[in-house]
Amino acid sequence: MEDGVYEPPDLTPEERMELENIRRRKQELLVEIQRLREELSEAMSEVEGLEANEGSKTLQRNRKMAMGRKKFNMDPKKGIQFLVEHELLQNTPEEIARFLYKGEGLNKTAIGDYLGEREELNLSVLHAFVDLHEFTDLNLVQALRQFLWSFRLPGEAQKIDRMMEAFAQRYCLCNPGVFQSTDTCYVLSFAVIMLNTSLHNPNVRDKPGLERFVAMNRGINEGGDLPEDLLRNLYDSIRNEPFKIPEDDGNDLTHTFFNPDREGWLLKLGGGRVKTWKRRWFILTDNCLYYFEYTTDKEPRGIIPLENLSIREVDDPRKPNCFELYIPNNKGQLIKACKTEADGRVVEGNHMVYRISAPTQEEKDEWIKSIQAAVSVDPFYEMLAARKKRISVKKKQEQP
């Protein structure tokens, strides 16, 4: 026994050497463990120091700013209110507009919704936001590209009208003499947006040529015609490069469902031979009705475009609170829709009508109201017709 450590007397020299090596290695490990303990203690002290620093005003401000952006993306009005209450944003149209224009971490759909509201503050922010855009010496398409990239244009007609009116005023202020009035700029802007859709939407088969585009815009310059070279340049620019529409999420459909017109659980009657009711999560947005198996699904099980469809209440002996989507004056054709099968294949729908049951009478009425609003006439065409009529009336009033 040596230093209180037991050592068997009958060990061979080789075994004694092995035992000595083990003891030495044990001592080295004990030293290493102690060193690691000291390093861990230092690291814990550093972590505690970092946690203490997180209590600093700068980090607290950054955290609250991130929280405010998140709130804005979910509810723009509440997000702005949160930032103002925490003194992260001044409650002035100019400061709010600058915050939206910079757009750091902001959802462009939410920006568009906020700018389109009719409240006095929102209207002032809209004009301050538009004033941050520099359109001097840009042709109309170039200016529209810049403007429409800074937010996502909302779907409501009145919101679009206010935003495009503000754009037309700003463009004419930056480029005096190009158009005789803001009405002309407004009408031509819509004509360009619709041209972009017609030329680049694969569902539009009848692509307008230059001559038709020129003919569409005759007489809009206070009764006179715009220079054909101007219209040709605008047409060529759109034909060669479509507008880039902001998408707040890159690779899936999530952005489509960010701010729906309506969403909720409904029962849908199947279109197969055996008619069964299935519970689905429905989302109404962008003039389409999407349905999912679960609220957490990123991809819908089915898509029902609402174009050319109507809606009506129906009685069903099996389910209460029913309504139907149908084609008016239908002569046996199926509704244009698609669904995803269990094996992932996308197939055409098999419905002449879609019968749906809501949980309550109140929810049924709300769904019918929302869907009726979604299947209304294209707001672009309504507003364009109204503005052209205004130009025509103004011209007649000016005639002796």
Curated annotation (Swiss-Prot):
Effect of R280A: Abolishes phosphatidylinositol 3,4,5-trisphosphate binding
Keyword terms, alphabetized: Cell junction, Cell membrane, Cell projection, Coiled coil, Cytoplasm, Guanine-nucleotide releasing factor, Lipid-binding, Membrane, Tight junction
Coiled coil: 10-67
Residues annotated as domain PH: 259-376
Superkingdom as given in the UniProt entry: Eukaryota
Effect of R301A: Abolishes phosphatidylinositol 3,4,5-trisphosphate binding
Residue ranges of every copy of the SEC7 domain listed in the record: 72-201
Keyword flag Ribonucleoprotein: no
GO biological process, one term: regulation of cell adhesion
Listed result of changing H351A: Abolishes phosphatidylinositol 3,4,5-trisphosphate binding
Full protein name: Cytohesin-2
The organism of origin for this protein: Mus musculus
Gene designation: Cyth2
